UniProtKB/Swiss-Prot annotation:
InterPro entries: Conidiation-specific_6, UPF0654_domain. It holds the Pfam family Con-6. It comes from Schizosaccharomyces pombe (strain 972 / ATCC 24843). Residues 22-45 have a biased composition (Basic and acidic residues). It comes from the Eukaryota. Signal peptide: none annotated. This is UPF0654 protein C11D3.01c. Belongs to the UPF0654 (con-6) family. Residues 1-79 are annotated as: Disordered.
Length: 79
């Protein structure tokens, strides 16, 4: 059985693909509107990985101060 998150991602990708016709893009948009919110709880992002990503961003010297502040805020929202 396909991962619903991957299926939704494929439809979203089609919307941004310049090789896809406008007619197909319209169908993809309608599909996404009809199936909004259907990705089940078991397919949500792993909270531990998300938390680790924010912590890594806060300690990465290549990340701007503004982005570090946002990562800190998002991390606080997770807890």
């Amino acid at each position: 059985m396909p991962n619903p998150g991957n299926v939704i991602g494929g439809h979203k990708a089609a919307l941004h693909n310049p090789n896809v016709s406008e007619e197909t893009k319209q169908r993809e948009k309608e599909y996404l509107e009809e199936h909004e919110g259907e990705v089940g709880e078991e397919h949500q992002k792993n909270t531990g990985n998300v938390r680790g990503g924010y912590k890594a961003a806060m300690h990465n010297p290549n990340v701007s101060g503004e982005a570090k502040q946002r990562a800190q805020e998002e991390l606080e929202n997770l807890e």
